[in-house]
Regions:
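Start-of-repeat signature of ankyrin repeats
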Residues: 1, 34, 64, 98, ...
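N-terminal "cap/leader" segments of large eukaryotic alpha-helical scaffolds
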Residues: 1-19
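Ankyrin-repeat intra-repeat helix-capping/turn positions
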Residues: 12, 45, 75, 109, ...
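Internal amphipathic alpha-helical repeat/solenoid segments
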Residues: 13-63
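Ankyrin repeat domain, specifically the short helix-to-loop turn at the C-terminus of the second helix
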Residues: 21-26, 51-60, 81-90, 123-132, ...
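Solenoidal tandem-repeat scaffolds enriched in leucines and small polar residues
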Residues: 78-79, 83-157, 161-163
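Membrane-proximal ectodomain caps of single-pass cell-surface receptors
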Residues: 131-134, 138-144, 149-204
Length: 204
């Protein structure tokens, strides 16, 4: 990547971005990017710059990890929310091993300092793209499978309540690559305060 463009993306300076575009009008089209300015800006949480690049060059959103993955990885929740508001399809972009942003949040630790943000992000993702609950990784795992494997009680509890409210219990019947249904994984998990009877009632 052009070093001036990289530096501008890291700093999140939109004025400098347009100065570079003015001096090199085809810079966003000409370069073969491995790491795009969008990703460079999203990683440190330079939200406005990331959104401006996304507007100028929409194709960047599909390169490697999405900017949403990078913002999540670095816990820039405000950047995540604004990127989702700009383009809800980012929620279904798959990164390494087929992990979507929903899977990524389901996988993160249940740190008390981050628990409320996790629930807020899960709610936001599912509000704007409810079909993302059906997305699976290359291992055929749903967000629920991942929550169980990661011992993420807050995620699992939220998703089960969401399934109950939205009548999408069929996701509990989806199996991973080992043939284990989401429902079976949940019933065998160590979260003793989950009520098995209420979980069974979700299955259509």
């Amino acid at each position: 990547m052009d070093p001036d463009l990289r530096g501008t993306a890291r700093a999140g300076n939109i004025n400098d971005l347009y100065a570079i575009i003015q001096s090199k009008p085809d810079i966003l089209d000409k370069e073969l990017f491995v790491e795009t300015p969008l990703h460079v800006a999203a990683s440190p949480g330079e939200t406005n710059f990331a959104l401006e690049i996304l507007r100028l060059k929409p194709s960047f959103r599909r390169k490697r990890l999405s900017p949403l993955h990078l913002a999540l990885q670095n816990k820039h929740s405000d950047t995540v929310r604004r990127l989702v508001k700009f383009d809800s399809k980012l929620i279904r972009v798959k990164g390494r091993e087929g992990l979507t942003p929903l899977h990524f949040v389901a996988k993160t630790d249940d740190q008390l300092s981050f628990a409320d943000q996790k629930v807020d992000l899960l709610s936001k993702f599912l509000d704007v793209c409810s079909s993302s609950i059906n997305d699976v990784t290359i291992h055929e795992e749903t967000a629920l499978h991942i929550a169980v494997k990661s011992s993420s009680f807050y995620t699992l509890q939220f998703l089960l309540i969401w399934l109950q409210k939205t009548y999408k219990g069929e996701v509990l019947c989806l199996t991973d690559e080992g043939g284990k249904a989401t429902l079976c994984c949940i019933l065998r998990c160590p979260f003793h305060n989950l009520r098995h009877a209420s979980i069974y009632s979700l299955v259509p």
